[in-house]
Amino acid sequence: MRAREPRAPTLTAMNPPSRDFRSHTPGFWADATEAEWNDWRWQLRHRITTLAQAEQHLRLTPTEREGLLLTAHKLAFGVTPHYFNLIEADNPDCPIRRQVIPLAGEAVITPGEMADPCGEDGHMPVPGLVHRYPDRVLFLVTDRCASYCRYCTRSRVVSGVGEQELETDFEEIYAYLQKHTEVRDVLLSGGDALLLSDNKLRAILTRLRAIPHIEFLRIGSRVPIFLPQRITPELCAMLKEFHPLWMSVHVNHPRELTTEVRDALGRLADAGIPLGNQSVLLAGVNDNPDTMRALIHKLLRCRVRPYYLYQCDLIHGSAHLRTSVAKGLEIIEALRGHTTGYAVPQYVIDAPGGGGKVPVSPGYVVYHDNEKVVLRNYEGRIFEYPEKPGAPSTLVRPETILDY
């Protein structure tokens, strides 16, 4: 009898080990059924949006109460049940809490702060489209988010209670893009594009894909972190139809990467969507090397490459959340060379007033002239690299090479 051939191993996608990944379900919503909890629309309907609701679950400080009262007239307050469960109820310094619970300091405008720190309104040729860079545009498809970050650079237009209304003229945008053949890259943002229904998002992507010179599409989203239930198999299958399509997610602290978020990111990655992360450097959230190192390592385990670390924009009322640029450089220097290169994000400042992203790096070039570059490596050691080739030398004479 012939021996049975060994069965080939079955290859399956594996989630990263459960170490460091936790679920906080159901938390404050113990009465929710599993079906309700996993329904992204249920999550949106049950967001915490008022001072009274927040006080039911958190021991609020006086400055938090004052900050919550301010949200009737500026950037709204709203947190999904999934994300609210991550907040430490008795710790006002909780890094999750600092990102979404407003403080009275939001009413204090310090020198240099602006309503539109990135100068987007001045680069908006048609309503809802920002054309600041030569070959790419920012398409603001909605003014709503799953939860509202207190450092939001578009707080003037996001959430419906800001200083301005977002007025996006979709047909005028499509006409502009048809005409401007230099545009090869469109980034969908807002607000958050993934809050749109599958059908609405498909309609936008279809119109963009019909424009021949647009090479690839991007979506910037915090939904996989605030509302991982939205990342359904149906959504992923639809997005897969529009490749090449990339996605930038927004994670600031390792605790945000729960088991549900890990699984949502895995579904996007399995759909062939390259994932990058954009963090904002925030005081009391991620402004130390250990926290940032834990975050970037955890992101890589979720198949997300750390892409940008932003200096917090000079948005009105953000002084209590901003760090010094020196702190950002210190963090990058603590990472560069000490961990995987793929894990180290590029530290950037969005130049105030509309200058665009400017990369900021520690001083690894000590000296540079026409003869040489003097370099400092991550250990502080000094090296020289010649700018011009020296005198030629021949290691092997051509006539000595045997012809076989």
Which residue stretches match the model-derived regions?
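Flexible, acidic/Gly-rich N-terminal and inter-domain linker regions that tether
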Residues: R2-H131
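Conserved, mostly hydrophobic/aromatic
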Residues: Y83, C149, Y307
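Short, charged beta->alpha transition segments
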Residues: M124-P127, V137-L140, F170-L177
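Canonical Radical SAM [4Fe-4S] cluster-binding loop centered on the CxxxCxxC motif
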Residues: H131-T168, I219
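Mobile, glycine- and charge-enriched loop segments
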Residues: Y151-C152, T181, R262-D287, Y378-Y404
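Conserved AdoMet/S-adenosylmethionine-binding subsite of the radical SAM
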Residues: E171-D185, L194-T339
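C-terminal accessory regions of radical SAM enzymes
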Residues: I332-Y404
